[in-house]
Amino acid sequence: RVYRGTDTQAPDPLIEAKQGAGNAPAYRGTAYVVFERIPLDRFGNRLPQFQFEVMRPVGKVAQSVRAVALIPGSTEFGLSPDPVSDEPIAGQKRWINRNILRARSDWTASLDELQALCPDLHHVAIVLPWFGDDLRAGSCRIRPGVTALSARKPSQVWKVENVTRADAHLISRSGDGAAYGGTPSDQSVIAAIRDLKARGLKVTLYPFIMMDVPPDNQLPSPYGGIGQPAYPWRGRITCHPAAGVAGSPDKTAVAGEQVQAFVDGPWGYRRFLNHCADLAQQAGGVDAFLLGSELRGLTGIRDGQDSFPFVTHLCALAAEMRAILGSGCQITYGADWSEYFGYQAQDGSGDLFFNLDPLWSHPAIDAIGIDNYMPLADWRDSDLDEGNPDGFETAYDLDGLTRQVVSGEGYDWYYASVEDRETRRRSPIADGLAGKPWVYRYKDLESWWSNRHYNRLAGAEATQPTAWVPHSK
C-alpha cells in the first residue's frame, strides 16, 4: 500500500492492528510504502532490493501553477490513457505510448506526476493539431496528419473524423524522421478529456494549426518569390500576395474570396473546428474551447468595404461552437499579443481599426483571449559592464521584470527598425491625432479594456465607437 504523504492520510490498518487502535501514527507529510505478506521465497528468503522514485514540489512555482497546456499535441496515441501497440516486424510487439513501467501509459504517468508536483492544478488545455500546407489562404488545406500511411497490427486503429490512416496527410520528413508527430486519434482525444474530468480537472480544447511546409517546397510565397519559409508560423497565413506586396488583393473583394476558401473549402477551417467541437461534445463536454489562435495574417485582411472578413467568419464560428457546446462552455479566440488590440495599416495611411471588436463583443464570446509573449526585458550581455537603461541589475531582476509589465517596450517606446533595436534607438509611443497613446500600446491592457474604441480612416477618427463596451468581457 502506498501512502503519498498527504495531510489527510489515515494510519495503515496493519500497523494499527499491531500497535493498537489510536497508537499508530498516520505519518502525515511523509510518503511511505507498506508490504504485507510479501512472499520472500521468491527472492531467496530475503528482502529484495526496492527502488522508488519520490517526487514533491520544491519552491513556490510548482505549488502556484493552476493551469497547464499539454504540448506539442502532435502525437497519434500520446493522449490515450490506455496502452497502444503495433507490430513493426512480424512477431515483434512495440508499445507506442508506453515508455515507462509505473503506469499503463505515458499519459497516465505524466498526469499522475503533474498532479503530484502541482497540487493546486485546476485546469488543463489539450492542444489538438491539424496540419496546414500553404501560407496562401485560398490554397491552404487543413487536414489531420500521420507519420506513416500504414501500421502493422495496431491494437487501436487511428482514425480522425472519417479519415483513415491511408487517406490522411502524410507529414513531411525532416532529418531522420517526421517533422511533427501526427494528429491525435479521435478515440484518444475523447478518452483524454474524460480522464482529465475524472481526475477533477477542468478541460480546455485548443484546436491548433501546425504548418507542414517542408524546406524543399516550390510554393509561391505571399510575401514574394518562389518557396515558402519552412515550417512557418500559422500567423503568416494570409491573402496572396500579402498586404503591402505588389498585386495584393487586400482591400478588394478578391481578398474576401480567398478568406472564404480558407474557411469553407473542402478542408477548410470550419470543418476543423466543427470536428473538434463534436469531439468535445462526444466526451461529455469541456469547460472551455478556443477558436484557434494567432491567425493575425488572416484577421488583418480587408475586403473592398474596409471590413475584415476572417473576423466575420470567426463570429459565425463562435455562434456555431456555442450551439454545439452549450452555455456551460467558455469560448474565446487566442489572439496574438500583437493582434488582440487592433490593426494598424502599414501603408502610410494612418488607418487604425479595432478589427477584432466584432468578435470580442459577440455574445458567444466569453473572454478576451491573448497568447501573451509581450517583451518584459531589453537585456544585453554588455549591460553587465555598461549598465541597463531600464535599471535592471541582472537579466533575472524580478523587480525590473515586474515594472516592465506596464512600462518599457510596447508601452512607453518601440523600436522602429531592426537597426534601431541593435543600437537601442528608442522611439516614444505617442498619438498626435487624439491624444490616446494607448491605441498603440499593446501592453496597456487596462486602457484598452476601459475605453470605448473608435476606428480611424484617412486621418480622421470615427464619430461612432465600435461595438466594444468597456469592462464587458
Language model features: what each stretch is:
Residues 1-79, 93-94:
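Polar, S/T/G-rich
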Residues 68-88, 122-306, 324, 329-338:
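Substrate-binding cleft and catalytic face of glycoside hydrolase catalytic domains
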Residues 91-119, 172-189, 270-271, 348-352, ...:
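Short linear interaction motifs
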